[in-house]
A protein has these predicted regions:
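Feature for soluble, non-membrane regions of globular proteins
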Residues: 26-240
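Bacterial Sec-dependent N-terminal signal peptides
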Residues: 1-28
């Protein structure tokens, strides 16, 4: 009965993940409650089925993106940590010293963290920014529409591969910007600094199967699958 429920509610991919977890123990809890102390012992589970974001992000893209690209970053990050002074260090502290840690930790640690964060802010059915976040958006950008335009432009104009971000800056304002490759706003080398609240992956592997070279179409589709409940929670935690 439980198997039937899983299939009906979440799809076959979720059943596979549940079975994989039970048999191997290699996938951990999908809540990702502590981003600054991500586990290097277990690869985090995707928090929904591969087809959960259809039609905006297709199931095949999600499968390849999560199980190949993201998993490779995790494995390579764990391997790069071994035997270094950073081996038992929380990932946020590694990022704070990433200029000294080297490219292997920068690229793979960034790829691991950024994807976990990306999965958690995606989802369907949330209502939108909370009153508190809406007020902060209005203060920093003038309106939600202006914020959305700024964020979308950061994503569309990032040359080559990278990420666009909404962050809470150290002075408690909201800011939008982008980072190259697998850099993120927690890294000491990033011009954009702050606590991440929202992101979009603009590497071609994130959208090419469905959108080909039309990154702008992918960015516009992204707004249909923002998990505002999680973004609101992140904002509440960040302003404490």
């Amino acid at each position: 009965m439980r198997t039937i429920t899983i299939i009906r509610k979440y799809g076959p991919a979720a059943l596979f993940l549940a079975a994989f977890t039970a048999l191997s123990g290699q996938v951990t809890n999908s809540k990702y409650t502590d981003m600054e102390n991500l586990s290097t012992k277990e690869f985090p589970a995707l928090p929904y089925a591969y087809d959960a974001l259809e039609p905006y992000i297709d199931a095949r893209t999600m499968e390849i993106h999560y199980d190949r690209h993201h998993r490779a970053y995790f494995n390579n990050y764990v391997a790069a940590l071994k035997g270094t002074a950073y081996e038992n260090m929380p990932i946020a502290k590694v990022f704070a010293e990433i200029s000294k840690a080297g490219d292997a930790l920068r690229n793979n640690g960034g790829g691991y963290y950024n994807h976990v964060f990306f999965w958690r802010i995606l989802g369907k059915g949330s209502a939108g920014p909370s009153p508190e976040l809406s007020a902060a958006i209005d203060k920093s950008f003038g309106s939600f529409d202006k914020f959305r335009e700024a964020f979308s432009n950061a994503a569309k104009t990032r040359f080559g591969s990278g990420w666009a971000w909404l962050v809470l800056t150290p002075d408690k304002n909201l800011a939008v910007g982008s980072t190259p490759n697998q850099d993120n706003p927690l890294m000491d080398i990033s011009p954009l600094k702050g606590k991440p609240l929202l992101t979009i992956d603009v590497w071609e592997h994130a959208y090419y199967l469905k959108y080909q070279n039309k990154r702008a179409d992918y960015v516009e589709a992204f707004w249909n699958v923002v998990n505002w409940d999680e973004v609101n929670r992140l904002y509440r935690e960040a302003v404490k």
